[in-house]
Structures are given as structure tokens and as C-alpha cells.
Regions:
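C-terminal catalytic histidine-bearing segment of alpha/beta-hydrolase fold enzymes
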Residues: 90, 223-232, 246-301
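Primarily recognizes the serine-hydrolase "nucleophile elbow" in alpha/beta-hydrolase
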Residues: 107-108, 114-171
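Short substrate-entry loop that stabilizes the transition state in hydrolases
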Residues: 46, 51-90
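Proline/glycine-enriched tight loop/beta-turn segments at coil->beta junctions
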Residues: 41-48, 217-219
């Protein structure tokens, strides 16, 4: 009798195992890695999220420094993490090249781009906003753009130029003066000074605190994420609030709202910023990945 009971127990366990477990490969997202991007593709896709890294970073950094990609793909959102970096502004040719890379990935891997959101951290937010503008003015865009977001990004290049000048004038934190010199020299070379070349900044900056600059995005859902920890910035960089990306992004947000964009959001956080394991308010981690996914899902309905 013991033999019979054991036989039936084994049979029941095997039956449950065969019927109740979906093969792992059917659930796991596909991962595609190329020199220009990493793609996470869920089995059942409902949206596409395109992410751009910070200035010296790449797709691997994006995934390592934030849970956004893995949380999104776990919820049926394909994630295209781009390696394109080192740009706070872009030429028209560069914009079309990156859009072409996105279009190529969508076509080659059968990605549904009918619900697309673009976002980036730091300079990656600059790239995201510039590409959003380019996609919106394209007669035949390769993706249907539903929203864009920037994470503590230096979108206002006039503000960035002026803050770099202030950094050079400070007697403290000499180690950051090289960065300020580089930014001023680069902007002088590319656009001229804001005082003498205001039209160039109006044309090339991702966003300025002006109606003309924000007008192309007045109907697009857009988010500005920032963690304005003024005590941290004062201690570590001798920066006041008006020198932070948070200050410039708030002005841009307010201008968008004044233009009639009811779906522009300025999102501040507290104590979330961690960069490479260390406390830093300028970080991917200030974004609540679960809430971001909910926002994307809402835009995709």
C-alpha cells in the first residue's frame, strides 16, 4: 500500500509541475546588445521607453545606476538604452542620425513604437528633449511620441553658461574650475556668448525660459525630475539654489504651464539621489521607477 501511495504522490507532483509552470524562456525578456544600444524586449509589449545616459556614461551605466529599465520591461515596456552621449546640444545631422538608429532598432527587432516615451539623465535629458522636438516636427516620424522626461538636466544653456562663469569666480572648490572652463569654451565655440548670440541659444538649446523655446512642446506630456538638496550642493560645490539645474528646470516648467501645457510636471524628490553608491542628488535614482512606469502606462492607453 505504501508503494501505491508513493506512486500517486509522484504522479500528482509531476502533473502539477507540467501544467502550472510556464517555461522560463517564454517569460524572460530578450536582450540585444549592440555597439550603439542595448534593447530589452518583453514577450508581450505595450510601450517603448528610450533612455539616454549622462555625459560620460553608456547603456550599461544607465542599467546599473537605476531600476527604471528592469522595472519597465517587467511591466511589458520595451526599453532601448542608447550609448549616445557627450552632448548637451546636437546638430540637425546628429539628431537625424540618432533618430535613424532608433528607427533601425525598431524595424530590425520588431518593436512596437506606437507608444514611445523618451527620457534621459543629465545631458541625456538634453538629448531627449532635442530629439522629442525633432520627432514632433518630422512629417513621417519613426516612433509615435507620447511623452518625454529629463532627470536633473542642464536644459537651459544660457543658465549653464552663467553658472559656469560664477564657478570660475569662486575661491572655493578649485577642482571644478576645469569643468567650468570647458563648458564656457565649448559654448563660446559652438554658439558664442549668450550676450552676443542670443538667437543661437534660442535655436540650439534644448529649452530656455522663453515662450519661443518651449512652444514646440506645449502639447506634449513632459516631466522634469530634480532633487534640489541645497544643503548638499552648498557643502560640496558652494552652489546656491539659483545655480542648480532645479532652478532652471522650474522656470522652464512654469513657462510651459503658462503656454497652456497642463501635462507638464515638475517633480522634486528628497533623499533619493545615489550615484555609484554614494549620496548625490544628481543621479538617475531620484526617479521613482514604479511611478514612472505607471505614467508611461497611462500615456499608452
Amino acid at each position: 500500500m505504501a508503494y501505491i501511495n508513493g506512486f500517486w504522490l509522484i504522479a500528482v507532483v509531476l502533473l502539477i509541475a507540467c501544467q502550472g509552470v510556464t517555461p522560463f524562456n517564454d517569460l524572460a525578456p530578450r536582450e540585444i546588445h549592440t555597439p550603439t544600444y542595448d534593447l530589452l524586449l518583453p514577450a508581450d509589449q505595450k510601450a517603448l521607453l528610450v533612455l539616454f545616459p549622462c555625459f560620460p556614461c553608456d547603456a550599461a551605466d544607465t542599467r546599473a545606476e537605476s531600476r527604471i529599465a528592469d522595472t519597465a520591461v517587467a511591466n511589458g515596456i520595451a526599453v532601448l538604452m542608447m550609448n549616445f552621449n557627450r552632448h548637451i546640444l546636437m546638430s540637425e545631422a546628429e539628431q537625424q542620425e540618432v533618430i535613424g538608429t532608433i528607427a533601425g532598432a525598431v524595424k530590425e527587432h520588431g518593436v512596437d513604437a506606437s507608444n514611445t516615451v523618451i527620457g534621459g539623465f543629465s545631458s541625456g535629458g538634453n538629448v531627449s528633449v532635442l530629439l522629442a522636438k525633432a520627432v514632433l516636427r518630422s512629417p513621417e516620424p519613426p516612433v509615435k511620441l507620447k511623452g518625454v522626461f529629463a532627470v536633473d538636466s542642464p536644459l537651459d544653456l544660457v543658465h549653464l553658461y552663467e553658472c559656469s562663469q560664477r564657478d570660475l569666480a569662486k575661491a572655493s572648490f578649485l577642482e571644478y574650475k576645469d569643468e567650468a572652463r570647458y563648458l564656457i569654451a565649448f559654448l563660446d565655440s559652438a554658439l558664442g556668448s549668450p550676450t552676443d548670440s542670443a538667437a543661437n541659444y534660442e535655436r540650439a538649446a534644448p529649452l530656455l525660459n522663453s515662450a519661443a523655446s518651449v512652444a514646440p512642446l506645449k502639447d506634449l506630456p513632459i516631466r522634469f525630475y530634480t532633487e534640489p538638496d541645497t544643503a548638499w550642493w552648498r557643502t560640496h560645490r558652494d552652489d546656491g539654489y539659483e545655480e542648480l539645474n532645479a532652478f532652471a528646470m522650474k522656470r522652464i516648467h512654469d513657462t510651459l504651464v503658462a503656454m497652456g501645457n497642463a501635462r507638464a510636471e515638475y517633480i522634486t524628490t528628497e533623499g533619493r539621489g545615489v550615484q555609484h553608491g554614494n549620496r548625490h542628488p544628481h543621479a538617475w535614482s531620484i526617479v521613482d521607477e514604479r511611478e514612472l512606469v505607471q505614467w508611461i502606462e497611462g500615456l499608452s492607453r
